[in-house]
Amino acid sequence: MKARIDAIIQRNQAEYLEQLIPQTDLLLREMEEYGGEHGVPSADREVALFCEITARAANATRCLEIGMAIGYTSLHLARAVGEDGLVVTIDPSDEMIKAAEGYLTRAGLRERVRIERGKRWTLFRSSKILLI
């Protein structure tokens, strides 16, 4: 669970919930450690898993992610959309994009993710997007 417990749940509740979450694979664990060591803003394991489960439940074949960082949530979403699906993700940082491409390639999911370099509003200036 998170390093600090939210005010919503107590420590023993958090520990119980932690036991319900499947063990993460080695690549995801490496990404978590890298993110922690380098101060990379990233979703918690619980949040990324929630995104994956939600995408699967919705039978989503296309997902949009804004702010990819090292690709932690992108990887979860790419698993969810399946072989013919696509995750479009946006990040302004060349450093983060390079790291994410490496992790996604190692996971065998790079072809499911289209990475756009830029800031969210400049990429969608002409689009009429209502909800992301």
Model-assigned labels for residue ranges:
Residues 1-23:
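N-terminal auxiliary segments of SAM/dcSAM-dependent transferases
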Residues 7, 32-33, 114:
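Homeobox/homeodomain signature
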Residues 13, 27, 47-50:
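Short N-terminal amphipathic alpha-helix/helix-capping patch enriched in small hydrophobics
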Residues 14-18, 32, 101:
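Amphipathic alpha-helical segments within well-ordered protein domains
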Residues 21-33, 40-41:
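S-adenosyl-L-methionine
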Residues 36-37, 41, 45-132:
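S-adenosylmethionine/decaboxylated-SAM
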